[in-house]
From Swiss-Prot:
Residues 71-96 are annotated as: Disordered. Residues 71-84 have a biased composition (Low complexity). It is found in: Cell inner membrane. This is Putative membrane protein insertion efficiency factor. It comes from Cupriavidus metallidurans (strain ATCC 43123 / DSM 2839 / NBRC 102507 / CH34). It is a peripheral membrane protein. The keyword Cell membrane applies. Its main location: membrane. One of its GO terms (cellular component) is plasma membrane. Keywords: Cell inner membrane, Cell membrane, Membrane. InterPro entries: Membr_insert_effic_factor_YidD (IPR002696). Belongs to the UPF0161 family.
Amino acid sequence: MKRILLALLRIYKIALSPYLGSQCRFLPTCSDYARDAIVQHGAARGTWMAACRLCRCHPFTKGGYDPVPATHGTAAAPPASAAPGRPPVTVRLPRP
């Protein structure tokens, strides 16, 4: 199912997107967001996340940077290069 959804997104980006123009107010674009969400979270949850994102993308929204949230457990895992005994450095970026 995941491969079918990704193929449909690829067809949309190649066949329809050039004719519709860039209308997305977010970065990454809604189609890129959908692809990333499906890859990271699977077909069902990724499709739900993409549908919610499409509902947020309208002319009255501010838009801005809105990446796909990380899967549970990956954000808190320390990097492999972290020194033993020292906590990893966490960088928090301001929300747009």
